[in-house]
């Protein structure tokens, strides 16, 4: 993996912490599975590690059929406009809006299909995750799909040094994407805790 090669070449082969949301969380899981010493801490948010082929097929069908419309520049502008009106406190900064309008419409449908195939349809947690030395904070929203909640529980079963945190009232990735201060208040105590000692959800909330 290019990420692992980069860490070995530029970071002495180890990081203090790694993390990711959704598909990014799968990448973090994979790194932990490949190298038990890659990080002291890991934060995973709303990630699947149990394949969902049916959900993948539905998502791929919709993206293949409507992707060009859903991710056109006009649609992206409309989405940002609606966010400004409906959720003004959650609106993106101007710099992020510019990237959103520039990058998303250029994303090939083939790339989106590949992401859905990997994220939903194929990725399965490896047993080697049990050897990882990292302490993990696994966040998921209360309103997540059941398969995401099941993935979190499976991860904890295989890698016991894991804290599960259910973000009450929130959907997929909502806490990290839209409530940065609340996310920081949750994560900082976890990062400051002793990585060699198990702690409970109550210790970081």
Please give the residue ranges for each predicted region.
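Gly/Ala-rich beta-loop-alpha elbow adjacent to hydrolase catalytic centers
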Residues: 20-24, 28
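Conserved alpha/beta-hydrolase "acid-adjacent" motif
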Residues: 145-151
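Conserved acidic catalytic loop of the alpha/beta-hydrolase fold
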Residues: 1-15
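Conserved alpha/beta-hydrolase catalytic His-Asp/Glu region
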Residues: 53-55, 73-128
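Short beta-strand/loop motif that positions the catalytic acidic residue
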Residues: 132, 138-140
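Short beta-strand immediately N-terminal to the catalytic nucleophile in serine-hydrolase-like folds
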Residues: 18-20, 45
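Flexible "cap/lid" loop of the alpha/beta hydrolase fold
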Residues: 33, 41-70
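Catalytic histidine-centered segment of alpha/beta-hydrolase-like enzymes
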Residues: 170-181
């Amino acid at each position: 993996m290019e990420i692992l090669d980069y860490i070995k070449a530029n970071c002495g082969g180890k990081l203090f912490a790694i993390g990711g949301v959704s598909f990014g969380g799968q990448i973090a899981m994979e790194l932990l599975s490949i190298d038990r010493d890659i990080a002291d801490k890991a934060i995973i948010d709303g990630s699947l590690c149990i394949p969902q082929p049916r959900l993948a097929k539905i998502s791929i069908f919709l993206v293949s059929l409507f992707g060009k419309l859903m991710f056109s520049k006009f649609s992206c502008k409309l989405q940002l406009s609606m966010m400004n009106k409906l959720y003004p406190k959650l609106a993106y900064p101007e710099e992020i809006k510019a990237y959103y309008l520039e990058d998303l419409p250029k994303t090939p449908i083939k790339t989106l299909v590949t992401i859905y195939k990997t994220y939903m349809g194929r990725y399965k947690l490896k047993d080697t995750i049990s050897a990882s030395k990292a302490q993990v904070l696994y966040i998921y929203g209360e309103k997540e799909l059941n398969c995401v909640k099941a993935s979190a529980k499976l991860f904890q079963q295989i890698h016991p040094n894991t804290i599960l945190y259910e973000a009450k009232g929130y959907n997929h990735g909502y806490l990290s994407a839209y409530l940065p201060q609340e996310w920081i208040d949750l994560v900082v105590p976890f990062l400051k805790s002793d990585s060699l000692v198990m702690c409970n959800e109550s210790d970081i909330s």
